[in-house]
Each structure stands twice: as structure tokens, then as C-alpha cells.
């Protein structure tokens, strides 16, 4: 059993209460962290289509990787999709800081895609074309339909991944074949080959980290997860009974592994201490290695490193070789990967990491000294180094200067200019100290920044890397990196001079830099970034600006790309960066319906930025009559689901690529229509994947009506009736609701569930995450599963309930005489809500049960045959849909939406205002902050002027901005003067628009000579883990064990008044003295002051 002692020891305030309970509590939210602020800023930039990013109704960005860097900077990378298909070559990356400012961004391409997604060539035919690109193919790893975007030209293509061999080396080749014509498009190889130093490291004996288990030691790093070294022939990690490794013989594989582990561990440490990177992968992992390849080579294959030999049979696991190969791994695990890189960039990246690791290890002669040559001591074929970074022509006459010939140059030779740039940046042209001189291509003399700073600048450029990276894009990326690292512009200017020194010309995307305090720049955002306007009406969005560097400046706003019949106005048209403006888009009665992209430009003193607004012009006015849903549109969605399934193994099972692309298709449609869309990751699902939740703005949130359908299918087939029919029906209803934009009397939420086929897991996960208040807010849930069965019936869940009334009323109006859905009871997602006490109903047309004679007489169809003869089968395609049943189901959903949640009159504009958190404290001389949130309650969004009153003498409260569009927020900052009297004060925040609303903030000013009786929560959150607390003296309050198990908290108090003016620590000690484990929860340490 476990025991736990609570000890109050000399080491808090005046009187403390500690509570402990043996029950789990959730951890506090981590939303307001530097990383979260950076990610939120990056997400907003992507959502707004900032500068070269694309905001289109057909295209989406999905966040993939967040990499912390130095100086509170974060690299946030995104992959792009088009109508549910991955866009290879369309990725982007945003560099943002912990204060929530966008510092730089780079996009692989800013071209908007408009291609057919229907393949004319089969995946099998594309595979045959792809196989011809390798000498031998061991395995077809995967095949998928993508949009290949290269040189700003989009092509629908099959991407086939093959493992095998070229004429000289192993290969993992990605081949792209035009899916319309069958022509080869391009390819790239994950396997990157190189060579290097096999000299032993020293002076000996060197120390390496190994793993010990009992009496066995293995060459597996216990700290650097994933790093190990194995015999290439057997694949077995080296192990032995002692922790003494290697023979000193360079032909010994074990010695080669010692050299590899030493070099890889030094590189890991360099990444952490110099560059701020968490391991080779960036998330605390490395990769395994093998020694013993018979080739005169070494390579990275996408998941491991393999070391070969030199002509003397010595294993080439020296520092610069090992660091070079793991440099390829870093290249693969930074934004953009290595796909489509210009020739030479990958090899030079490996060489740069080799030079950095040599410099970090700083070994003396005769070992591998820091020298900026590659493989200088291995003498691979008796000719010395294989590359020279300060003088590339010294080896094989490699080029030192960039030219238009570089993209077509052999990859190792093409590394010359980038290697030369790195040396010029690190050391300059005449470094002295025994280091070699290096000449520039333009005859200038340069001073270096040092190898560590050069490494930071280059690595920062890698964090802005995209696919199809080029020398010219690296120039822009490293200039942005240098600018972010150094406000004085010294690093920026030297980085620029080094690029000029190898003849890489200036680019239009290059940033500019002036000394600290003068380098003024800003960013822009839109909230929301898309919307629908009816003919004869208007829609608004808030254009936000943020100071990213330097001081605020005047920004003039303009809009372009307006469709015929739509005009734009800004209020105000010019703002100071840091302020916002309201953009109003007004459509005439004759404005052409359809989608378009409005480009909003902000022109500063010398720089400009753009954001994109996705506008949809609707062709009809909102009204109270339920609309007729066009079944052809529903069938079009089903066709898209069918296409997605055929391109991804024939199904859309939860967790599969088919499901992911289906979700992306639905999500893209909803975002373009103006919905607030959320993906919820179902961690408890059989196949972990995402639910999709879409909220239509308007209507009271505490009066919510939900409409749901499961999006997943079984692996046996495309799942078009089960349940593409329900999913497509809801999607089209959601789009029509957005187009009509009627007055909402209730809030409407749509949901597409994952993992239903494995046991209603997605919807159950969602319901279980709801608080009691959130459950109470849902006044009804409607489920739609298999609503297009070919031999279908007309079934309603809980047909005689109040919730079912609108569904029943519509089908009854068609003389369909609907029946209870007995077959589907407990078998679809409505059951999850029913179990939580939420009223439910829904439509179904039947599954594998058989239609009775009476039903066939009433509804038509075949008696004694299954409602759906293709239930859970491969034939559940678009041919397995009864359009009449589907149409009646879709129209019935619209009838229910309108009857349950739509009003008849144009709504009065109204909004709400709330402060979060609603209370805070600060000492005299200190400060605190909160967020003022607004929301549109009814009608259209409106401009809300914000003010704050009630601040006592000495307290200054400010809002930024002081005017927002309802639905946006403002920052409340409270500064407490040094002479402010302690006490609790109420600040009132007032929002004024068509009406006025207020919200309050309770400010507690602490300190002072007097004492107000009150209870202070000194540990209001929940913590897990341990802290290094120590007691110099103390008193045990109580000892607890698992015998004291309690469903609530056991509260203990102690009078600490005797320690007035001193510091007191409460210590909680847990001791395991038997195998039975016991958990304790300690929470809410409070102080009662009197």
C-alpha cells in the first residue's frame, strides 16, 4: 500500500488549507501559452489568406507541424488540399512569435487551383508507368490521387511510391503520373546518398550513451529516443555483457557503430544547445542506423541511416558523414520535407550539418577537426575530400557561384554554391586564425557572423521551407530568419551580402530590414474570412492589423476582385497598424450569384500585405418557408464521396485516407459557406479520426438544435447509401441554410460522425465531452442514416414524439404514412444522445430488413426484399440510391430545420458582451489583463464601440481595439499604480451598437498594511507531477493511505499565524512501500486571511 504525509514546513502566508482526494480531475487549459498564441496567429494568417497564402472555397490548409525555435519563435507548417485531394507542392509555413505576431511566411505556390478531379487513367496503369523509373522494384508502398503543383502548374496526378533500386543505390521513389493523360510528370527520391569520414573520434577513449538491462548492454541511446546502431547484415542492434565497445580496428562494424553513436550524440547536443531543436525529428526523437553496407557510400532512406565503407574497407562513420546523413533526416522532418527541392540543396544541407557538428565537437588533430571540408580524412578513393565548402572548385571543379545551370547540375556538384554561401556567412572572405580565405563571385570582402550564428540563420530558413525549395527561396527564407534573430539588422545584412556573394539575386519576396526601432512592419487578418451575401443586401467582416516589428504606421485599405454588382467600403479606410476596420460588401439586386475571392490590400509606408475574403453571392432572399432541396446537388456530393472511395482502396472507413478526404470535402464546403467548423479528434475511437462539427451563426446558444449523420462507411465498399446519403443530405441542407441566411430563433449545429460502424464511437465521444450545461442547451438531436435505400421505406425514430413532429408532418403531407424505425433502434448515432437524456428523432429508409407486403402496397417497391440489397457491401455505390426517397428525405430535413429554428421576420440586430476571465488581481505597480468577447445574438454582425469605467484612483484600464465587429474580441489591459489602495473594485465594460450591453470585471488590488477578511486561492488550478520542494522543519498534519479512500476531498487546516512575515511551504510526500499503487489528488491550497 502507499502512504502519503502532509507536512507544513518552514520555507507561505498566514493560514493554509490543503485538500487531498483520490479522484481524477482534468488538467487546466493551456490555451494562453506562447506556443498557443503563435499557433493562433499562424492559423488566422492561413484562414485569412495573408499575402502568398490562398483563401479559396475549394482549397484548405491543414496544420501539420509546430516547431519551437529560439527567441520565442515558432514555425507552423500547413499542407494544402483541393476539393479533398492532397496538393503536393502547395504547402506553406508561417513563422510567428509567442506574443501572437506573424513574423514571416512562405508558400510553395500562391496559384489558385482549378482542375478536374476525375481521373481518366487508372491507378494500375499509373503504377506500370512508375515502375519503369527503377531498375528493380521490390514493393509498391502506396498509391494516391493528388494534385501535383510544380512551377505553379497544377496537374491531377497519381502519386505512386516504389521501393527498390536504381542502377547504383537503394531507392524509395515517389513518381507522379498525369491522371488525365498517363504521361510522366516528375519524381523525387526519399533515399539520399552521401560519403564521409570514417576516422575514429578522440582523443580516446570516447564516451557514448548506451542502454543497460540487467547484465546486458546495447548500442541503443537511453536518452535520445530512436537512436541505435545495428549490424547491416543481421539488422540486430549490437549488445554485449560489458559497456566497453569497439576494437580500434576501422574495419570492425562494432567500431563503426561506436563512431556513429558518438557523432550522432554530438549532433543531437549541437541541435539542442546551438539551434534550439528537440532532436533530429524536432519532437524528441532520432532514427536508427546500421553499419556494414558493402557500397562505397552512406545514405538516408527516409527512416534510417546506413553506413558503407571506403576503398580500404573502413566503415565511414566519421562525424561529418554521420551528421551529413542525419542532416538529410532533419531536412525531411522540417516543413516542406525534401519534395521537389532544387538540385544540390539536400546535399549542401547535409554538409552544413556536418560542419556544424564538427565545430560543436571541436576535436583536435589528428581527429576530425572543424575544417569545412567533407570526407577529408576518409580518402574515399585516394583523392582526398569529396567537397570543399570554402573553395568548391578545388574538388571536381564544383561550381562556387549560382547560375541558371545549377538546377540541371548533378546533386553533389550543385551543392557547391550553398556550401560556399554558408562559409562566407560563417567565416567571411578573410577569417584569419588559420582558417582559409574564400573569394566571392562579385569581388566583395565579407566579415563572418560565426559558425553558430550561421547555423541558426540557416536552420531558421529551414523552418520556413516549403516543398519545391530553391536557392532563391532559401535566400528569402534565411533573410527572414536573420531579421527575426537580430533587430539591429547586422545578421540580416551579412546574410544578404553572402547571397549576393554567390550570385543569388534579390527576390521580390525578400524582406527588408532597418535598425531596431525603425523596421516598421505589420500583418493583416480577416474575421470572418468568408461569408454569403444576398442580392440587395450586405455582409461585413473585420479587417484586423497588427504591428509585427517597429512602430505603428498608417495603413490604407483597398479591395479588388469584386464581382459585378458588388461594391466594397471600409470604415475607416485608413487605420494605424494595431487597429481594425469594418469592410462592408454590398450586393445590388442584380448581382450575379456565385463564389469569388475579394483581395483586401493594406498599404503601409513602404510595404503592403494582402488577405483574401471568400464571398458567395446568394440569388434568393431569406424567408420563412422551408426551401426545396435540389436532389441533384445531393447526388453530386454522393458522386464526390464515390470518387474519393475509388481513389482510396474502394472505401471510406473511419481513420482511412478515404474518410479523411471525405471530411476535407465537407469541411471545405462548410467553411466557404461561412460556418464555424471544428474538427474533434476521437481518441477513444477504434480507428482514431475526427468528428466534424459545424455551427451556423445566430440563434441563442442555449437553444440549440442538432442535425447529424455518420460520415464513415465499412471497408467492404464506398458506403454511398450507408451513410453517404445522410452525410450528403445534411451537407446540402447546411449549404442552403447559409445561402438563405434566414432569421434564426434557435441555434443550428450540424455534425458528421466518425467510427459509427465500429459502435457509435464518434458520437459517443462527442456527447461524453459535453458539460451538463452544454447537454441541456441541445433541445433536440436529429439523425439521418441510410436515407436513400433503393427499396426503401419511410421510417422515423421515435415517430410519435414531440421532437419527431416536424419530420412526421412533412412526410405525412406527402401521404407517406411513416412508421417507427424499429430496425434502427440503438444502432445509429441518435442512441448516443438518447443515452444522455437528449430528445432524439431522425429519418431512415431501411437497411437489411425486408419490406413487408403492406409496406410495398403503401410505398411501392418489392415485398420480401431487403430495403437496401447492398447493405455493407461493395455494391453500395451511387447506383444504390433511390433518388425519390433521397429527395423526400432531404426536403424533410429542410422542413425540420425551418420549423424548429427559423423565424419569419428580419431580425433586430443584437449582440452580447462578456469578459473572460471575469476577475483578476494585481499588486500595486503591477498589471493584469482579460479578453472582452462579443457575439452576434441576432441579425447581422454590427460594429460595437467598447469602453470601460469604474477604475479607482491609480488604476488605468484600456481596451485594444476600442471598436470591434460583433463576433470579435478586444484586449482589456489593467495597470495598477504603485500608490493604489488595496481592495476589490468592479470595472464595467460597455458595448454600444444598435443597443448597449455591459459586463463586469472584478479587480483585486493586493498588498498594503491593512487586511480585508477573505479567502485567497493560492493554487486554483490542478497540477500533476512533482516539484523540488524541501522542508527545513515541519509538522505532519495527517498520514493517509489507500485505506482512507474517499470519493471526496479530505480537508486539513493549520494555523500559520505564528509565521507571520515568513514563507511557509506545504509539502505532500508520497511513498510506495508495497506493490499496490495508490493515486492521490491534491488541489486548492487556500489561505484564509483575517
From Swiss-Prot:
- Taken from the UniProt record, the cysteine pairs bridged by disulfide bonds within this chain are 870-875
Q: Which UniProt keywords apply?
A: Disulfide bond, Hydrolase, Metal-binding, Metalloprotease, Protease, Secreted, Signal, Zinc
Plastid as UniProt keyword: no
The positions annotated for binding Zn(2+) 2 are 722, 757, 872
What Enzyme Commission number does this protein have?
Answer: 3.4.24.-
GO biological process, alphabetically ordered = proteolysis
Which residues act catalytically here?
756 (proton acceptor)
Q: Note the CDD domains from the entry.
A: M28_SGAP_like, M4_TLP
Q: Where is this site: Transition state stabilizer?
A: 871
- Cofactor: binding details: Binds 2 Zn(2+) ions per subunit.
Where does the record place it? Secreted
Q: Which residues bind Zn(2+) 1?
A: 710, 722, 785
The molecular function terms of the Gene Ontology recorded here are: aminopeptidase activity; metal ion binding; metalloendopeptidase activity; metallopeptidase activity
| Reported cofactor(s) | Zn(2+)
What is the annotated quaternary arrangement, including any partners?
Monomer.
Q: Which family does it belong to?
A: Belongs to the peptidase M28 family. M28A subfamily.
Q: What does this protein do?
A: A leucine-specific metalloprotease that plays a role in controlling the amount of leupeptin during colony development. Degrades leupeptin into three components, acetyl-leucine, leucine and argininal.
Q: Know the name of this protein?
A: Leupeptin-inactivating enzyme 2
Amino acid at each position: 500500500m502507499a502512504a502519503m504525509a502532509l507536512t507544513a514546513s518552514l520555507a507561505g502566508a498566514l493560514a493554509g488549507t490543503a485538500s487531498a482526494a483520490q479522484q481524477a480531475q482534468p488538467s487546466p487549459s493551456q490555451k494562453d501559452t506562447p506556443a498557443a498564441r503563435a499557433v493562433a496567429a499562424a492559423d488566422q494568417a492561413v484562414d485569412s489568406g495573408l499575402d502568398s497564402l490562398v483563401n479559396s472555397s475549394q482549397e484548405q490548409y491543414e496544420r501539420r507541424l509546430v516547431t519551437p525555435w529560439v527567441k520565442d519563435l515558432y514555425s507552423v507548417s500547413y499542407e494544402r488540399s483541393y476539393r479533398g485531394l492532397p496538393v503536393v507542392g502547395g504547402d506553406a509555413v508561417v513563422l510567428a512569435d509567442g506574443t501572437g505576431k506573424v513574423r514571416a511566411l512562405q508558400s510553395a505556390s500562391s496559384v489558385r487551383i482549378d482542375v478536374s478531379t476525375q481521373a481518366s487513367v487508372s491507378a494500375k496503369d499509373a503504377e506500370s508507368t512508375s515502375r519503369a523509373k527503377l531498375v528493380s522494384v521490390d514493393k509498391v508502398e502506396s498509391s494516391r490521387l493528388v494534385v501535383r503543383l510544380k512551377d505553379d502548374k497544377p496537374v491531377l496526378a497519381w502519386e505512386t511510391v516504389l521501393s527498390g533500386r536504381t542502377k547504383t543505390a537503394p531507392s524509395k521513389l515517389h513518381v507522379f503520373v498525369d491522371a488525365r493523360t498517363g504521361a510522366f510528370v516528375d519524381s523525387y527520391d526519399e533515399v539520399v546518398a552521401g560519403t564521409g569520414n570514417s576516422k575514429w573520434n578522440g582523443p580516446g577513449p570516447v564516451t557514448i550513451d548506451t542502454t543497460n538491462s540487467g547484465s546486458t548492454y546495447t548500442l541503443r541511446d537511453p536518452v535520445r529516443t530512436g537512436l541505435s546502431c545495428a549490424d547491416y547484415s543481421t539488422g540486430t542492434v549490437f549488445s554485449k555483457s560489458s559497456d566497453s565497445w569497439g576494437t580500434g580496428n576501422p574495419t570492425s562494424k562494432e567500431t563503426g557503430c561506436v563512431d556513429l553513436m558518438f557523432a550522432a550524440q554530438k549532433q543531437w547536443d549541437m541541435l539542442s544547445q546551438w539551434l534550439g531543436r528537440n532532436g533530429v525529428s524536432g519532437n524528441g526523437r532520432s532514427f536508427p542506423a546500421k553499419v556494414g553496407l558493402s557500397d562505397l557510400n552512406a545514405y538516408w532512406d527516409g527512416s534510417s541511416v546506413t553506413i558503407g565503407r571506403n576503398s580500404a574497407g573502413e566503415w565511414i562513420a566519421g562525424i561529418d558523414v554521420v551528421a551529413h546523413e542525419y542532416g538529410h533526416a532533419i531536412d525531411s522532418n522540417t516543413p516542406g520535407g525534401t519534395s521537389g527541392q532544387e538540385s544540390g540543396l539536400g546535399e549542401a544541407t547535409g554538409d552544413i550539418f556536418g560542419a556544424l557538428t564538427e565545430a560543436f565537437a571541436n576535436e583536435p588533430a589528428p581527429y576530425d577537426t572543424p575544417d569545412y571540408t567533407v570526407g577529408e580524412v576518409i580518402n574515399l578513393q585516394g583523392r582526398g575530400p569529396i567537397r570543399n565548402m570554402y573553395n568548391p572548385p578545388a574538388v571536381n571543379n564544383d561550381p562556387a557561384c549560382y547560375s541558371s545551370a545549377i538546377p540541371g547540375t548533378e546533386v553533389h556538384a550543385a551543392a557547391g554554391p550553398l556550401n560556399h554561401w554558408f562559409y562566407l556567412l560563417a567565416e567571411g572572405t578573410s577569417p584569419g586564425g588559420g582558417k582559409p580565405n574564400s573569394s566571392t563571385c562579385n569581388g566583395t570582402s565579407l566579415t563572418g557572423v560565426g559558425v553558430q550564428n550561421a547555423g541558426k540563420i540557416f536552420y531558421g530558413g529551414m523552418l520556413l521551407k516549403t516543398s519545391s525549395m530553391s536557392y532563391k527561396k532559401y535566400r528569402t527564407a534565411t533573410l527572414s530568419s536573420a531579421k527575426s534573430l537580430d533587430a539591429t539588422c547586422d545578421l540580416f545584412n551579412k546574410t544578404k551580402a553572402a547571397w549576393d556573394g554567390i550570385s543569388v539575386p534579390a527576390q521580390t519576396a525578400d524582406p527588408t530590414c532597418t535598425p531596431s526601432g525603425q523596421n516598421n512592419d505589420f500583418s493583416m487578418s480577416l474575421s470572418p474570412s468568408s461569408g454569403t451575401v444576398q442580392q440587395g443586401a450586405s455582409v461585413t467582416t473585420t479587417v484586423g492589423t497588427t504591428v509585427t516589428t517597429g512602430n505603428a504606421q498608417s495603413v490604407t485599405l483597398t479591395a479588388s476582385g469584386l464581382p459585378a454588382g458588388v461594391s466594397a467600403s471600409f470604415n475607416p479606410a485608413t487605420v494605424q497598424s494595431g487597429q481594425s476596420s469594418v469592410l462592408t460588401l454590398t450586393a445590388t439586386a442584380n448581382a450575379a450569384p456565385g463564389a469569388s475571392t475579394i483581395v483586401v490590400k493594406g498599404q503601409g509606408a513602404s510595404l503592403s500585405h494582402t488577405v483574401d475574403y471568400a464571398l458567395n453571392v446568394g440569388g434568393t432572399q431569406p424567408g420563412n418557408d422551408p426551401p426545396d432541396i435540389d436532389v441533384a446537388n445531393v447526388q453530386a456530393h454522393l458522386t464526390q464521396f464515390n470518387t474519393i472511395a475509388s481513389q482510396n482502396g474502394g472505401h471510406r472507413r473511419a481513420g482511412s485516407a478515404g474518410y479523411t478526404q471525405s471530411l476535407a470535402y465537407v469541411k471545405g464546403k462548410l467553411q466557404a459557406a461561412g460556418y464555424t467548423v471544428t474538427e474533434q479528434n476521437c481518441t477513444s475511437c477504434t480507428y482514431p479520426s475526427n468528428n466534424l462539427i459545424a455551427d451556423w451563426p445566430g440563434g441563442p446558444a442555449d437553444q440549440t438544435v442538432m442535425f447529424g449523420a455518420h460520415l464513415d462507411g465499412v471497408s467492404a465498399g464506398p458506403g454511398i447509401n450507408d451513410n453517404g446519403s445522410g452525410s450528403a443530405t445534411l451537407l446540402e441542407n447546411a449549404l442552403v441554410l447559409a445561402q438563405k441566411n434566414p432569421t434564426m430563433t434557435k441555434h443550428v449545429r450540424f455534425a458528421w460522425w466518425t467510427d459509427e460502424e465500429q459502435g457509435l464511437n464518434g458520437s459517443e465521444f462527442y456527447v461524453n465531452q459535453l458539460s451538463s450545461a452544454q447537454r441541456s442547451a441541445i433541445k433536440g438531436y436529429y439523425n439521418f442514416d441510410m436515407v436513400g435505400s433503393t427499396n426503401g421505406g419511410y421510417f422515423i425514430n421515435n415517430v410519435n414524439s414531440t421532437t419527431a413532429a416536424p419530420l412526421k408532418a412533412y412526410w405525412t403531407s406527402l401521404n407517406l404514412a411513416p412508421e417507427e424505425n424499429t430496425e434502427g433502434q440503438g444502432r445509429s448515432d441518435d442512441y448516443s444522445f438518447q443515452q444522455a437524456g437528449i430528445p432524439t428523432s431522425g429519418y431512415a429508409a431501411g437497411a437489411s430488413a425486408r419490406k413487408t407486403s403492406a409496406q410495398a402496397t403503401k410505398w411501392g417497391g418489392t415485398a420480401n426484399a431487403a430495403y437496401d440489397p447492398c447493405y455493407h457491401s461493395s455494391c453500395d455505390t451511387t447506383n444504390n440510391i433511390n433518388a425519390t426517397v433521397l429527395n423526400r428525405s432531404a426536403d424533410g430535413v429542410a422542413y425540420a430545420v425551418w420549423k424548429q429554428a427559423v423565424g419569419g421576420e428580419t431580425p433586430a440586430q443584437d449582440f452580447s458582451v462578456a469578459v473572460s476571465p471575469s476577475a483578476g488581481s494585481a499588486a500595486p505597480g503591477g498589471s493584469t489583463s482579460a479578453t472582452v468577447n462579443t457575439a452576434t445574438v441576432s441579425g447581422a454582425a454590427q460594429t460595437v464601440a467598447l469602453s470601460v469605467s469604474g477604475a479607482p484612483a491609480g488604476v488605468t484600464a484600456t481596451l485594444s481595439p476600442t471598436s470591434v465587429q460583433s463576433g470579435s474580441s478586444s484586449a482589456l489591459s489593467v495597470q495598477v499604480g504603485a500608490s493604489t489602495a488595496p481592495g476589490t473594485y468592479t470595472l464595467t465594460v460597455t458595448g454600444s451598437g444598435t443597443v448597449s450591453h455591459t459586463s463586469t470585471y472584478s479587480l483585486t488590488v493586493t498588498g498594503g498594511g491593512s487586511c480585508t477578511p477573505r479567502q485567497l486561492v493560492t493554487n486554483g488550478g490542478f497540477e500533476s507531477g512533482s516539484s523540488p520542494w524541501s522542508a527545513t522543519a515541519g509538522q505532519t498534519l495527517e498520514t493517509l493511505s489507500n485505506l482512507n479512500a474517499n470519493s471526496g476531498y479530505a480537508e486539513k487546516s493549520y494555523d500559520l499565524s505564528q509565521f507571520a512575515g515568513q514563507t511557509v511551504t506545504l509539502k505532500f510526500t508520497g511513498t510506495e512501500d508495497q506493490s499496490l499503487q495508490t493515486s492521490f489528488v491534491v488541489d486548492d491550497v487556500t489561505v484564509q486571511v483575517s
